[in-house]
Structure formats: structure tokens, C-alpha cells
Amino acid sequence: MNIDDKLEGLFLKCGGIDEMQSSRAMVVMGGVSGQSAVSGELQESVLQDRSLPHQEILAADEVLQESEMRQQDMISHDELMVHEETVKNDEEQMDTHERLPQGLQYALNVPISVKQEITFTDVSEQLMRDKKQVREPVDLQKKKKRKQRSPAKILTINEDGSLGLKTPKSHVCEHCNAAFRTNYHLQRHVFIHTGEKPFQCSQCDMRFIQKYLLQRHEKIHTGEKPFRCDECGMRFIQKYHMERHKRTHSGEKPYQCEYCLQYFSRTDRVLKHKRMCHENHDKKLNRCAIKGGLLTSEEDSGFSTSPKDNSLPKKKRQKTEKKSSGMDKESVLDKSDLKKDKNDYLPLYSSSTKVKDEYMVAEYAVEMPHSSVGGSHLEDASGEIHPPKLVLKKINSKRSLKQPLEQSQTISPLSSYEDSKVSKYAFELVDKQALLDSEGSADIDQVDNLQEGPSKPVHSSTNYDDAMQFLKKKRYLQAASNNSREYALNVGTIASQPSVTQAAVASVIDESTTASILDSQALNVEIKSNHDKNVIPDEVLQTLLDHYSHKPNGQHEISFSVADTEVTSSISINSSDVPEVTQSENVGSSSQASSSDKANMLQEYSKFLQQALDRTSQNDAYLNSPSLNFVTDNQTLPNPPAFSSIDKQVYAAMPINSFRSGMNSPLRTTPDKSHFGLIVGDSQHPFPFSGDETNHASATSTADFLDQVTSQKKAEAQPVHQAYQMSSFEQPFRAPYHGSRAGIATQFSTANGQVNLRGPGTSAEFSEFPLVNVNDNRAGMTSSPDATTGQTFG
């Protein structure tokens, strides 16, 4: 067999079954014969590479030719048309070969021959495929004809036994495009979309779309149950109900759950089982997956607690491994482990919002490590962590406060925290006898540190209301127990008013500041802290504030005296003359010898104020509550009181802004004087009360007022008061106050028991008070016991 025959057999294999019947295929073979030498050599080399003998290939070619010749009559016209198109494509390829140079033809012929040989993996398999392809065409044509056939009518058997033709589904619904065979079925279907129910029950007015539904419903009213169970005799309206019931007797369970492969006898039970078991289980799995995703995301973000995990013992690490089930044990911590590891230090977080979200203020506080470990720990961490951060630790309520306050000096870097963040937590300033005794002269530095960072609470309570109730009761319990410190600042409002607390503490501790002027909020804090310790009655102080809180701005001194011959005491308690006893006692330098004298002096001063208020309240026009009760039986204080600071800060510095000019009061004087400064001269010169204005409509003369006060005093019991002279106060403590309050003290001049008052302001400064007239060029106003020479203050 020559090369042309071989090429002819190969192209027949590639072309298909019907290639032998095409005349164009023979033409192609003839056209290619000019190149037979080159292509034949290439194909022979490929065949030799595949180790296939020439005899087997030739035998296969002969078998294919014979089988194709036997089937030439069965080839359809369509297949011949497809074959012609393939031949045209082959011709185009050959034309490209002829046009290309000789060098490119070799390159193009090599892959063509390879592709041809790849299709023939095995000769025996190829023969079997060819035999199947010979049988397939006729069968495929028959199947295609059956699918494509759509007969116009279908032969049916009617109810009477006659034959009939049935038309296909030509009626289509406009709403859902459903097709029906008859218009009746279509109209019945349309009722579903329109909601129309033409069939109505005559007994219960229920309506139905179809007539058979109505008939089945009417059986309920008639009680007819045509379907009966053979085993138990139960009857049913529907046949489906009877068949479902029979499965209970037979034990048949045809419905299976697709999740757990359990079998059930009814479909509703399968649905109920899926809802109860598998759907809830899937939800739980989804939740677990979400939690697991969150945990892994925390691991990826680097939010680990490795210092905590490395300190865990072996048993606790095993417990965390069991609970995490394969997760990283450095990222998952159990809550029980956190409760047990109270002695371990929590990790240092860079943001304070973590502290806000994670920890309760009532259970956590600032605490430094113990001296044995904390020193090296802080030194090592100081070079790595910038800036220094809080070390938080959970406080056990049963533990006592073991650490002294000298560690608070090491917490000075806490000033880097913002006030707005620190003010979210309410802390209490430490006031304990043992802690204060251990400090000594370092009291001032400690309070400075306490201003920067909140200290540890004395008691650890889980309820904030209980803590506040304890603070309210504590003021009565600590009245006579604290001898070392004058001011117990139980400030519960440090969170809302941090600046007020700092100002109050600074005014108590600072030695250089002799007369610090505080705002009204700071004064409120001072009043609470002072009268709790000094056992001065709350009613007295409250009445003093209420009585003189409606004075105009700028009052620095109010000079008044009681026209009483029995009151022989020359009490001159001015804000500039009060010794600085409390400040010296705050730093531990007070003397216990003069404490009893000062206590008696302040007790006498309290009684003096009460008597003055009793007299003025009877004649004052704007005291609307005549039933004011004042406690006069003050107990002797075991510790030196601090009324001097009250006189200094409250009565000399509180601004009063509500003056009512329409009311008459014998105690109102020039509006530029302060609240209380009892400037009383020598004992033999009693001074009268003088009014600050002359009301021409209803004015009370000074003589009438003095006569009234004198008559009332003679009728009353005459108490004996101890005389205190100016020389009784220590001179070293007077000097700072005279120096600092020089601007206020220059307004007064005392000569022979008479007080001269000069107001720096004019009537223009108080234009809202028409009855007040103060001129700069008028002479000094003199207050004397003589009613004829006494002038009213205006």
C-alpha cells in the first residue's frame, strides 16, 4: 500500500463516518498528493514514535472502509450537508498551506499529524466506538421525532365509553401564565387571583372556589363520614385522613427526616421534628460560629493577654484547653479563672475606655504592686511602656488597707490622665487615723498627689447607694474621734466637681495662702466638712446663710453691736484677726494647751450669734418664719474647732447677689461690706444696731429701736459672757491675716469704742438701690450708744 492510501485512510478517520461518500473528499486527497512525500514522512515518524506496526493500521483502515461502505445508503441528507461544510474548512486550510512558504509548511504539518494521532489511543477501542456510531443515527432520529411531535388532538375515552379527541392546553392565565385545556379550568384558576369564591355553604356562610370543596365541607354539617377504617371502625370525611390513620395500625413510616434520617408516619410530624430539633440546632451552630469568628478576629488583631496566660498554673491551662476545644489558649480565658487570679496583675491597657467597659468602680481601684515585687517591676517596665499606665487590681472587701499612702507619691504620672475620664468614677479621699499618723510631715505632698490621681476607697462596696448612705452617717460618728486632722474631706462629688475639691484641699493645706478666696461651690464643700467636725448646730449656720444671703455684691464687713449693758465681752472676731490655728494643726504643729480656750471662745461666739439673730428676727421685716428654733446647748469640743476658717472663707468671701431694697432690716448697712465681722470696741461702750437706709414712708428711728432692744433685754434672763480682748489672740498668727487682708481692713477705723465705716463705692455702683446714697466726700459715719448722735447707714 502506497503513501496515498495511508493518507486517505488517516483523513477518513479525522473527517468522520460519511467522508467516503463525498466526492469533494477525493478531490482534496488528490490535491494533497503533491505534498505526499513530506507529509508521509512526518506521519511515519509519528507512528514509529507510538510503536504501532503498519499492518495493524492498514487492517484498521480496511475495516473502516468496509463498514462505511455498508452504511452509505443509510446516511441522511442533513449529515451530508454537515460533511460538506467540514470539507470546505479542510480546503481552506489546504489553501493556506499552498500560500505559505515551504519552511512554514513543515511547521504547520507537524502539529496536524500529531493531532490526528492523539485521537487514536487504542485500535480496539476505536473499532467499538465506530460500531456504536453506526447504530446511533437511526435511533437518535426516532427519539428526536417523538419529542418534536405535538399532535393537535389526543384520543380519549369518555365516560359513556365513546372515543373522543382532546385538545392540548391552549388556555393561558393572564396573571401567572398557567396553561389549561379548557376555559372552565382557566376560570376556576382565575378565582385564586381575584379572591372570588362563588360557592357558599348554606349553613355556615363559608365560601369556596370549587364546588367539590363545598361538597366536602357540607359533610361536616351532615355528619357524613363515608370512609371507614377496617381495623378500628373509625370514620373519616376524606380518604386521605383514613389512609393516614391506617399507618398507625400498620406501623408504616414513609416520611424520613433528611437531617437525622428518622422515619415518621405523618408529614406534619416531620415538619414539627425539623422545627424543634434541627432548625434550633442550626441557629445554635451559627451563633457558635459567629463567636468563634469573633475570637479568631481578636487573635488576629493582637488583642492577647499573654502575661496573664503565662502565669497560669498547669491545671488552669488544661481547663482552658478543654473549654476552647483546639483554640489558642493564650487568647481564651474563663471567667472562673479571672475570679481566682485576683493576685495576678491585669494587663496594662493603653486606653481608659477598656477600664470603663470592663470594670465596676465599686470593686476596682488604683493600687501599686507590693514593695517586694513592685519596685523591680516598675523599673523594668518604665523603659518599655510610654506613658505609664494604671495597674488595676480587684479589691477583696474583706481585706484591710495594708499599704500606706506614701505609695501615692509614685502614682504622680497619673496626671497624664484626662480629667473628663477620671471624673467618670467617684472616689473618696482617704481619712484614716493610722494612715495619717504614719505620714507625719508629708501630708501636703500626699494631698497634692491625691489631687492628681484618685486614691483607694476606704471601703469596697458593690452598691453605690450603700456607700453614699455610709458617708452620710459617717459625719455623726467621727465628730469626736479624730484629733490629728481638722478637715475630713469626705467629698462625694469629686467626679462632678474635681476643680472644687482641689481648691478646697489647697485652701486647707497650703501654708503660704493665708486668705484664699474660693468660689461658691468650693465654699459649699467647706461648709459641709467643717460644721460636721465642729458640732456647730446645722440650724445656726443655715440660718446665718439664709438670713444674710440676700446682700448685694461687694460686702466685706458688717459692723453691728448689741446695745446690752450685760454683754461685757469685747469679742472682736474679724476675718483678718483670726489666728491660723487650723492650718497649723493640719500639718501636725498645733498645741493642745490652747484648744479648750478656743473651743470655749467659739461656743461663746455661737451663743452670741444666736442671741443676735433672736433679736433681729423679731424686728426684721423680711423674716417670714418666726418659728425658727436655734440649738443653744453646744457641747464642749474635745478637739480644736475650725470656726476661724469658716469666718475667713464663708463670711468674708462668699459673693451674695440678691439684694431686695424694698424690705426693711435694722441689720442692713452699706452694701460694700461683708457678712459677719463683729467689730466690737471696748467693753464699756455698747454699740447700737443701725439701719442701712432711711425709708421715709415707714422709717423706724434709731432711738425707738434702741429703747425696744434695751427693754427686751432687761426683761430676759441675763447671761454672763466671758470677756475676750484682742490681746488674748496670739500675735504671730495675726500678722499674716493683717497683711493679706489689708485691702479690707483699711475700710474701718476704731477710736474710743466707736466704729467709723467708709464705703469705697458710690451710689453709681448700686444704681438699682434708689434708697442707698453713699458719697465719697461725706464725713465718717459714727455709731455710738447715744441715740441723738447715732446716724443711719446710707
UniProtKB/Swiss-Prot annotation:
Primary role: Involved in transcriptional regulation. Represses the transcription of a number of genes including gastrin, stromelysin and enolase. Binds to the G-rich box in the enhancer region of these genes.
Residues modified as N6-acetyllysine: 607
Segments of skewed composition (Polar residues): 574-588
One GO BP: positive regulation of transcription by RNA polymerase II
Post-translational events: Sumoylated with SUMO2. Desumoylated by SENP3, resulting in the stimulation of transcription of its target genes.
Assembly description: Interacts with HNRNPDL. Interacts with the 5FMC complex; the interaction requires association with CHTOP. Interacts with CAVIN1.
Compositionally biased region (Basic and acidic residues): 321-336
Cross-link (Glycyl lysine isopeptide (Lys-Gly) (interchain with G-Cter in SUMO2)): 6, 88, 115, 132, 291, 308, 356, 402, 421, 424
Gene Ontology CC: Golgi apparatus; nucleoplasm; nucleus
Localization of this protein: Nucleus
Phosphothreonine modification, residue list: 194
Modified residue annotations for Phosphoserine: 51, 250, 301, 306, 412, 665, 784
Disulfide bonds: none
Keyword Coiled coil: no
Region annotated Disordered, chain positions: 298-336, 574-599
Family annotation (SUPFAM superfamilies): beta-beta-alpha zinc fingers
Keywords: Acetylation, DNA-binding, Isopeptide bond, Metal-binding, Nucleus, Phosphoprotein, Repeat, Repressor, Transcription, Transcription regulation, Ubl conjugation, Zinc, Zinc-finger
PROSITE patterns recorded: ZINC_FINGER_C2H2_1, ZINC_FINGER_C2H2_2
ZnF C2H2-type span: 171-193, 199-221, 227-249, 255-278
Location in chain, cross-link Glycyl lysine isopeptide (Lys-Gly) (interchain with G-Cter in SUMO1): 356
A GO MF term: RNA polymerase II cis-regulatory region sequence-specific DNA binding
Superkingdom assignment: Eukaryota
Annotated tissue distribution: Strong expression detected in brain, lung, liver and kidney, with lower levels detected in spleen, skeletal muscle, testis and heart.
Family under the similarity heading: Belongs to the krueppel C2H2-type zinc-finger protein family.
Protein name: Zinc finger protein 148
